[in-house]
Amino acid sequence: MAEKEKIKRNRREEILQALAQMLESSDGSQRITTAKLAANVGVSEAALYRHFPSKTRMFDSLIEFIEDSLITRINLILQDEKETFNRLRLILLLVLGFAERNPGLTRIMTGHALMFEQDRLQGRINQLFERIEAQLRQVLKERKLREGKGFIVDETLLASQLLAFCEGMLSRYVRSEFRYRPTQEFDGRWPLLAAQLQ
């Protein structure tokens, strides 16, 4: 019984990896059908539905992976790093680096892969970015408590500016067919961003 469950889990992972790879390829700029996905995996559409009740559920699983990866690591950054600007820099680098290592998932993060899917999926991505923005805002607000100095500009505005930078870099990555890496020249960009936060 355990062996059967392991095979099923492996097939599920194989399906999700195939979907992510298709999103990374030129197929990712178009609607991915279950027929195309089944052909890519080398199984029938019926076999896909034995592992996932719908394509929406496949996207849900990929979004869950994105959420778990980012939020877990953001929490580790907040736990390990105490200095405000280092926290912010590491959170931005985390989001950009994750996208760079997972181009297919970046299409989901930017919403490009979800244009032809259920609105609920886009809502989940919106919630993810709202959570990241809330974390950035909290880091900014905690500066006064941790370091004894606040910001001239409202923390809400600053957090949205940092998130907009991230989202812009992810969109550029997708638009360029993954040529312009999100972390490219980050070391030069960060001082410009940090200067806006003073």
Curated annotation (Swiss-Prot):
The gene is slmA. It comes from the Bacteria. Keywords: Cell cycle, Cell division, Coiled coil, Cytoplasm, DNA-binding. This is Nucleoid occlusion factor SlmA. Residues 33-52 bind DNA. GO terms for cellular component: bacterial nucleoid; cytoplasm. Signal peptide: none annotated. GO terms for molecular function: DNA-binding transcription factor activity; transcription cis-regulatory region binding. Belongs to the nucleoid occlusion factor SlmA family. Pfam families: SlmA-like_C (PF22276), TetR_N (PF00440). It comes from Serratia proteamaculans (strain 568). It is found in: Cytoplasm, Nucleoid. NCBIfam families: PRK09480.1. Residues 117-144 form a coiled coil. Residues 9-70 form the HTH tetR-type domain. Required for nucleoid occlusion (NO) phenomenon, which prevents Z-ring formation and cell division over the nucleoid. Acts as a DNA-associated cell division inhibitor that binds simultaneously chromosomal DNA and FtsZ, and disrupts the assembly of FtsZ polymers. SlmA-DNA-binding sequences (SBS) are dispersed on non-Ter regions of the chromosome, preventing FtsZ polymerization at these regions. InterPro entries: DNA-bd_HTH_TetR-type_CS (IPR023772), Homeodomain-like_sf (IPR009057), HTH-type_TetR-like_transc_reg (IPR050109), HTH_TetR (IPR001647), NO_SlmA (IPR023769), SlmA-like_C (IPR054580), Tet_transcr_reg_TetR-rel_C_sf (IPR036271). GO terms for biological process: cell division; negative regulation of division septum assembly. Homodimer. Interacts with FtsZ.
